[in-house]
Amino acid sequence: MCGIWALFGSDDCLSVQCLSAMKIAHRGPDAFRFENVNGYTNCCFGFHRLAVVDPLFGMQPIRVKKYPYLWLCYNGEIYNHKALQQRFEFEYQTNVDGEIILHLYDKGGIEQTICMLDGVFAFILLDTANKKVFLGRDTYGVRPLFKAMTEDGFLAVCSEAKGLVSLKHSTTPFLKVEPFLPGHYEVLDLKPNGKVASVEMVKYHHCRDEPLHALYDSVEKLFPGFELETVKSNLRILFDNAVRKRLMTDRRIVCLLSGGLDSSLVASSLLKQLKEAQVQYPLQTFAIGMEDSPDLLAARKVANYIGSEHHEVLFNSEEGIQALDEVIFSLETYDITTVRASVGMYLISKYIRKNTDSVVIFSGEGSDELTQGYIYFHKAPSPEKAEEESERLLKELYLFDVLRADRTTAAHGLELRVPFLDHRFSSYYLSLPPEMRVPKNGIEKHLLRETFEDSNLLPKEILWRPKEAFSDGITSVKNSWFKILQDYVEHQVDDAMMATAAQKFPFNTPKTKEGYFYRQIFEHHYPGRADWLTHYWMPKWINATDPSARTLTHYKSAAKA
């Protein structure tokens, strides 16, 4: 995890513009660099480094002697870089995984390059010989990327929007900043004056398609067919591989553990993989919650079962409320459920940064969207409709859960790794017949639970524990986090303010006082940028007025049972 930033065709003083790049310094606390592009005085790169691999030669932009005309700034991890290096006999100058991008591009061009990358990434690649600029982002947008571009060809790119909003340009006083779409790459022409012109935007991968890099994967051969035992075996193989490949780091690895199915599977598998790799340190797991939190109790059971070195982080309602301003600033969104869920993750990341030397964190993000884990999937009218909704959620991860996971950890200089969003694992899961993936017997993620039932990775009570949203599980059922927040904002937003909400906020008008309160904070930090959130996250197929699972009939029934 790092912070990348670049300008092309700036007509303002670069030393002034570069101040904007310092707004993402939290993403790379170990080192930073600004570098002008040779022959283009109005083009430059900025890089904030979190040293995870190759501490000696890992600074960026990456340039190697063999390709003096190529400049690369990237944020991410390319897990198959060694396999590709060996397959094509590339001669590396560094041990940095991103160097593979330069070699692949020289060999086969940008499309083949990006399709061959197994990992999470956002990059800016400059080819001064052919006068081209390329931007690219991974399939699910696990690594963030934003851009601003004017009609006269000024281009600015950054890992977070906050690094672009204060940039100046003579023809456009208010730069439109927007997220770069996941699963896409863009080709731009570089003009002699340093400005650019977009040539094409290409969608290179659909989440259901097996990625091209699967041809060079180290995964053992999968069994054909959709018999249940065959599918379960294949899923176990792919999940183990997804965790194993993410061990790539020179820094200590830890794991977030809520006690829910997803993070518990990741933690247990991770501990197994670390032992097999003969890693010498014990796995640390971290859980957060208020007193009487069901997550703390469940996480404690998992930690005892797998034998991790477990840490519990307690917080109270006042600490959570006080963090809201920092959280919304870090998130760059005002989505209600995202803000709620981010507070706990922000606070536990802060604790890890302050109290440990670890920077690489594993987590269970992406599973709910992939495996139909949200409780409202019980109301899906058909398996086909559930499949459509699952794919929609995956496509929008970069606006919600992936955004939350990245910003709350990156705010404290940490790097998150998410095995459930592995290309091979997710594409295989989505290739299964729709009826195999729906909730069964009143239990969501039934297939995933069945898959690991005989693996001894988890206690049965955890494997079959009902879904609990992270923002709900950190507090007790009697005093839910969403209720604490709503009670607080009741005294911050009055009825008169709500009556004029549509006039004050005509786009994505908040319908609740909680939503109004978050929007106020967002507008304070990012005035006029409400379009970064296209819509609020809400459950489907039910008449929900609040995104919390604890407001749903299914949850209430389960809680009473």
Swiss-Prot record:
Binding residues annotated for ATP, in chain numbering: L256, I288, S363, G364
Transmembrane segments: none
Domain Glutamine amidotransferase type-2: 2-191
Gene Ontology CC, one term: cytosol
Gene3D superfamilies: Glutamine Phosphoribosylpyrophosphate, subunit 1, domain 1, HUPs
Effect of L414F: In ts11; temperature-sensitive. Blocked in the G1 phase of the cell cycle at the non-permissive temperature (39.5 degrees Celsius). Heat labile
Biological pathway: Amino-acid biosynthesis; L-asparagine biosynthesis; L-asparagine from L-aspartate (L-Gln route): step 1/1
InterPro entries reported in the protein's UniProt record: Asn_synth_AEB, Asn_synthase, Asn_Synthetase, AsnB_N, GATase_2_dom, Ntn_hydrolases_N, Rossmann-like_a/b/a_fold
Location of Phosphothreonine modifications: T545
GO-annotated molecular function: asparagine synthase (glutamine-hydrolyzing) activity; ATP binding
PROSITE patterns, sorted: GATASE_TYPE_2
UniProt EC number: 6.3.5.4
Keyword set, alphabetical order: Acetylation, Amino-acid biosynthesis, Asparagine biosynthesis, ATP-binding, Glutamine amidotransferase, Ligase, Nucleotide-binding, Phosphoprotein
SS bond partners: none
Record: residues binding L-glutamine: R49, L50, A51, V52, V53, N75, G76, E77, D97
Protein name per the record: Asparagine synthetase [glutamine-hydrolyzing]
Gene that this polypeptide is encoded by: ASNS
